A protein has these predicted regions:
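Aromatic-lined substrate-binding rim segments of carbohydrate-active enzymes
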Residues: 1-55, 89-90, 168
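Polysaccharide-binding and catalytic clefts of secreted carbohydrate-active enzymes
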Residues: 42, 47-168
């Protein structure tokens, strides 16, 4: 997506054509907002607009090259692009089924910091732990993330993992 809303599927089409020539099937991997923690595959228009697409921050407020998972703008842009890709795949491959699977995201997480400390993340951290998570973990204790899980690195990782999972 070189420009917002302008999709170029030439590479996707080329991969499908090549796979068909060799009687192969494809499993695509959607990196979207993150790849191995970083937002390196996000389009340039996302990378350049840190106001619309804020970055994650370390505990010391150092900005990271990681778009925050707490940004609805990021989620909506990622969702639109993914939906357009899936519509395109359906249009070009619904008969031959060359693509047999789409893996959504891979190795998301944070390096350098266990969790995001951006203003959006801090707001979520001060909120009560979502009831569905407490239920899934069979926890009776209610409260904020710090009250329920403590304040160590493992607690921070639980917080971040939950919100990455919710995003995806």
């Amino acid at each position: 997506e070189p420009n917002e809303g302008k999709y170029d599927f030439a590479l996707v089409d080329s991969v499908i054509t090549t796979a068909r020539k060799h009687d192969l099937k494809i499993v695509f991997l959607w990196f979207g907002a993150w790849k191995n923690s970083m937002s390196c595959y996000a389009p340039l228009w996302v990378k350049e607009n840190t106001k619309r697409f804020p970055r994650s921050l370390t505990e010391n407020s150092k900005p990271l090259e990681i778009c925050t998972a707490f940004s609805d703008n990021l989620l909506q842009a990622d969702k639109r692009a993914f939906c357009e890709l899936m519509k395109h795949i359906k249009a070009v491959d619904s008969q031959e089924n060359t693509i047999i699977m789409m893996q959504v995201e891979n190795e998301i997480g944070m390096l350098e910091s266990a969790r995001d400390h951006s203003p959006l993340a801090e707001k979520a951290y001060r909120q009560p732990v979502p009831a569905p998570l407490l239920k899934a973990l069979k926890l009776k204790k209610k409260g904020t993330w710090a009250e329920v899980f403590g304040t160590d690195r493992y607690a921070d990782e639980k917080f971040q993992a939950y919100y990455y999972a919710k995003y995806v």
